[in-house]
């Protein structure tokens, strides 16, 4: 159980919370189901930081339901369904992500570009061009969209 406690300690460090808050603020976005907006987050965290940390440590913190939003796709009449967490839940998710990423990022494939820090579509294209220049002639393009649609969303 020691490693789990150590990870929780890292996640709940005030420096990590501050960085998570800054990232959520940079990302902007609308509020979740509770209506709290990003610009209301700092005063809330200043006032409730200790109780929030205690709730998480004691296993009593419960994330709020997400606010459902439909974003139109390029195809007419089709929509992408999103769940928008509350801004407080986004901070907590960001705290976890920051620490988990430090642990696992080095283990991911160098040829994986989706949803990775400091990587994106342009990096993937540069890698493709390098592969072509190195003599590779085949490309496999795959997407797991159908699998993702089947995942339960709560």
How would you name each of these model-derived features?
Residues 61, 84-87, 115-119, 147-149:
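Conserved, non-catalytic sequence blocks in retroelement Pol enzymes and Pol-derived host proteins
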Residues 30-37, 122-154:
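Conserved catalytic palm subdomain of right-hand nucleotidyl-transferase polymerases, strongest
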Residues 1-46:
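Non-catalytic, polymerase-adjacent accessory regions of viral genome-replication enzymes
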């Amino acid at each position: 159980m020691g490693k789990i406690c150590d990870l929780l300690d890292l996640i709940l460090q005030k420096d990590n919370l501050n960085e998570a808050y800054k990232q959520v603020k940079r990302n902007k976005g609308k509020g979740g189901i509770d209506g709290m907006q990003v610009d209301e987050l700092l005063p809330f965290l200043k006032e409730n930081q200790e109780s929030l940390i205690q709730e998480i440590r004691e296993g009593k913190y419960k994330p709020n339901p997400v606010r459902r939003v439909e974003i139109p796709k390029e195809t007419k009449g089709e929509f992408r369904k999103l769940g928008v967490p509350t801004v407080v839940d986004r901070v907590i998710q960001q705290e976890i992500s920051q620490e988990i990423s430090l642990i696992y990022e080095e283990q991911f494939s160098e040829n994986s570009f989706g949803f990775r820090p400091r990587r994106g579509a342009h990096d993937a294209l540069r890698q493709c061009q390098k592969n072509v220049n190195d003599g590779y002639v085949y490309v496999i393009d795959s997407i797991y969209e159908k699998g993702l649609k089947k995942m339960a969303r709560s």
